[in-house]
Amino acid sequence: MSDPTTAREAIALVADDFTEFSFTEGPLAGDGPLGWPGYSAAHARASARTGETESVVCGTGEIGGVRAVLISFEFGFLGGSLGERTGARAAAAHARARARRLPVVVLTATGGSRMHEGMRALLQLQLLAGESARTRAAGLPQIAVLRDPTTGGGWATLGAGSDVVLALPGAQVGFAGSRVRPPDADPAAYTAEAQLAHGHIDAIVTPDALRGTLGRWLSLLTRPAEGPASPPRALGDPDTPPAASGREAVARARHPERPRAAAYLDAHFSVRAEISGDRAGGVDPGMRCGFGRLPDGRTVAYAAQCGTSTRPAGFRTAARLVRLADRLGIPVLTLIDTPGAANDPEAERAGAGPAIADLFAAVATARVPVTSLLIGEGGSGGALALAAPDNLWATPDSYFSVIAPEAAASILKRPPEESAATADQLRLRPGDLLDLGVVRGIVEN
């Protein structure tokens, strides 16, 4: 069942002080570009029923103290379908957002392209995708809220093309609408919950929490910190002396009670909002990515490994985070803590190598400053991909190595009891890393 909320009710749910855009439009020409029998009458009935003249309502409103352009779909108007006028209005809204340097919030509820207008309607997808790309290139954030339903071209342009994608619980979300799917298709695959599980949306938000969630996101994405992020202070025991050996450094980094990414994020940021998924079918709970507010009210983006072997989806999500922060001019903080990249057959099938390469490239080409802190295990390339060149720091409870000591001993055909000596030879302690010029410094507790 479709969301009964109208376009204007959806706007009122999330925004204050809404000012609608006016559009200069002539009367609908007959039965449209195809001369579709009865189209003009259907259009008139939809207008009379909803009080709207098209399937979108556009304007500006205030959300959490941030002015934004809103594009809200009216599903009661011909199923919220995308016609030429729909495209023209949404395109104009994007153009006005760029002219005024405002973020864009889209409240979708659409079945897709309007068949009464044929290819002229389908071409609106190119128009909207282009406008979204230009807004993205202008460094302005775009947030989509997927209402029920969000299918077809609306999902594939304004929905999935947004920087942050939120959805209402139970919303029907998918490229294929309910009437064009295979007859044996599992309907659960076309839901917001399924899209979240497969990395295509960032969060499911209840209607009562939507205003606050949007306000938090807009506040974070529009107030970047100035200059590089400072590395957080270490959270371990300040009275613990430096590791006396490589083996001890590894043991401390692997200790189950050592502070992990969650503790660092909680201590460093007063407010956070997280993205989820790599937009390619994967989610890695061991890589937390998002945006956090510093005590001065400014925003830093973060990508944090949580001590597990990082999956390909985790590397791709981190790359997505770095590129989004770069477009918005927000400095990045990365927290490194992994025994290494996942190396099981499924990880290889999911593209471990290409995913790591993608993250290396995102960090290397970022125009915003990137700061990295090694908080635990630094396991080879799976850790290095998240490290900022020339701006890497370490905590006393960490190590960084070309390979785990046990694996190195195995490759060198040494007996297991020689792994401790191998750890010393690898010079992986924080102090060793400082001497080698790998890290800039060791942060204190």
Residue ranges and their predicted role:
Residues 50-54, 80-92, 274-286, 310-323:
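Glycine-rich anion/phosphate-binding loops
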Residues 1-63, 67, 211-300, 304-307:
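Intrinsically disordered, low-complexity segments enriched in small/flexible residues
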Residues 110-227, 339-445:
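Conserved catalytic cores of soluble enzyme domains
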Residues 61, 65-74, 89-114, 292-306, ...:
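A structural preference for short, pocket-lining loop segments at secondary-structure junctions
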Residues 7-10, 42, 86-89, 93, ...:
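General structural feature for long, well-ordered alpha-helical segments within catalytic domains
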Residues 69, 75, 83-86, 121-127, ...:
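Glycine-rich phosphate- or other oxyanion-binding loops that anchor nucleotides, phosphorylated ligands
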